[in-house]
Amino acid sequence: MNITTISHLRKYKQRQQKFAAITAYDAAFASLFEQNGIQVMLVGDSLGMTIQGNDSTLPVTLEDMIYHTRCVRRGAPYCLLIADLPFMCYATLYQAYDNAAALMRAGANIVKLEGGGCWVTKIVRCLTDRAVPVCCHLGLTPQSVNILGGYKIQGRDKDSADRILSESIALELAGAQMLVLECVPITLSERIADVLTIPVIGIGAGPVTDGQILVMQDILGITGNRIPSFAKNFLTDSRDIPTAIQLYVQEVETGKFPAVQHYFS
């Protein structure tokens, strides 16, 4: 098995080859995912909700992220591993340097941060200059839930769509290696995926992005009745978890997922 790098994802984008990513939080599931076709994993601060049982990602600490990043890396030594910088862990440049370095030492290949304002762009540039690859996150940014007024679709009106597009361009120019685009209309996703040269991974952003990512609990249907409209329970049509992961990868790569019911017009 070969190690997956950001260069591979850039080549996938150039060839218009879709790829599947998934959240992971422990060694056992990470190993299973890697063995069944997943090349990109995210240790997301979503663990605050899916693992810890909180109602948002805000309580997650850097120590939580370091612990779970180490676990996932042990289980999946070949994947491209993204790790979230949690809430208020990159509020200043020096804080961003120290905390990003800690996640990289724990096994992350790329650190992810949310937002696209001028201060975020500056942090992206400074981290990149110091050899820390950055994945950015626009659209619905869960760490901003209290400002956004809940978990709502973003970029529906022209002004907000233009702002998100402009921010995505600025982040790439600042050195961002990847972009996660969450819960935006497919028309905006298509504009962003077309204009950027870096890989764009969508979640609730339609089939036009270069890759797709879902929370592992949603894919396996272990979130009760709270599966988001943009997600799909792949275990329903599978005999076991490995088969469900293989089906997810296959449907992403062939363009079958996400279907029209999984994105916003």
From Swiss-Prot:
SUPFAM superfamilies per UniProt: Phosphoenolpyruvate/pyruvate domain
InterPro entries: Pantoate_hydroxy_MeTrfase, Pyrv/PenolPyrv_kinase-like_dom, Pyrv_kinase-like_dom_sf
Reaction(s) the record says it catalyses: 3-methyl-2-oxobutanoate + (6R)-5,10-methylene-5,6,7,8-tetrahydrofolate + H2O = 2-dehydropantoate + (6S)-5,6,7,8-tetrahydrofolate
Disulfide bonds: none
Cofactor note as given: Binds 1 Mg(2+) ion per subunit.
Residue positions binding Mg(2+): D45, D84, E114
GO molecular function: 3-methyl-2-oxobutanoate hydroxymethyltransferase activity; magnesium ion binding
Enzyme class: transferase
Record flagged with keyword NAD: no
Known cofactor(s): Mg(2+)
Top-level taxonomic group: Bacteria
GO BP, one annotated term: pantothenate biosynthetic process
Keyword terms of this UniProt record: Cytoplasm, Magnesium, Metal-binding, Pantothenate biosynthesis, Transferase
CDD domains assigned to the protein according to its UniProt record, in alphabetical order: KPHMT-like
Positions bound to 3-methyl-2-oxobutanoate: D45, S46, D84, K112
Pfam families: Pantoate_transf (PF02548)
E.C. numbers: 2.1.2.11
Gene3D superfamilies: Phosphoenolpyruvate-binding domains
Protein function: Catalyzes the reversible reaction in which hydroxymethyl group from 5,10-methylenetetrahydrofolate is transferred onto alpha-ketoisovalerate to form ketopantoate.
Family label: Belongs to the PanB family.
Protein name in UniProt: 3-methyl-2-oxobutanoate hydroxymethyltransferase
Taxonomy of the source species: Bacteria, Pseudomonadati, Pseudomonadota, Gammaproteobacteria, Candidatus Palibaumannia
Gene: panB
